[in-house]
């Protein structure tokens, strides 16, 4: 392996490892739930409520059933809790092509630890891990990661500086030893402020190819 100071390659999940819906409307279409009154749904009072609920949910402070009910209320009654659950469960999709192979290649590199640091929640995490049903095997790429750090278990979320500090402790790595891929600039910027090596990924392009290129630049891959 080429000389590199990188000891940990850390991935965000949605938009980097796994395709996800990028809007409520897209998830509704996947779930077979009608889109109702977009102008009412988008009202600021409801949008702010939903944002606060997502923060509680993804940091482990709100159970799934309570989240469905609360989000349904924060749509102004446009959607039922059952419909919210269906839309939410449709949000995650398949791995980006080539990412599982990339992680497998990294796992063969001596001295390199693969990990994720993701804002997620119990339902999405169960789907991604294949814990819900034998018919839903989960993400092969995520199954290949040596360490998984997720917001609802940590009680913290990106871009809070505290989650990056918690990751450093969990991974037993200094900031410059971590190379972090995320599709949101606010998250890579916060990690960079702690001294992490960071790359913002374009989720609309080949994510595996982007990451391979940067891993070669950093001397992690030949």
Model-identified regions with their sequence ranges:
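Catalytic-core regions built around general acid/base machinery
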Residues: 98-110
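Short polybasic/polar patches that bind polyanions
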Residues: 29, 58, 73, 108, ...
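A local structural micro-motif
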Residues: 36, 80, 114-115, 176, ...
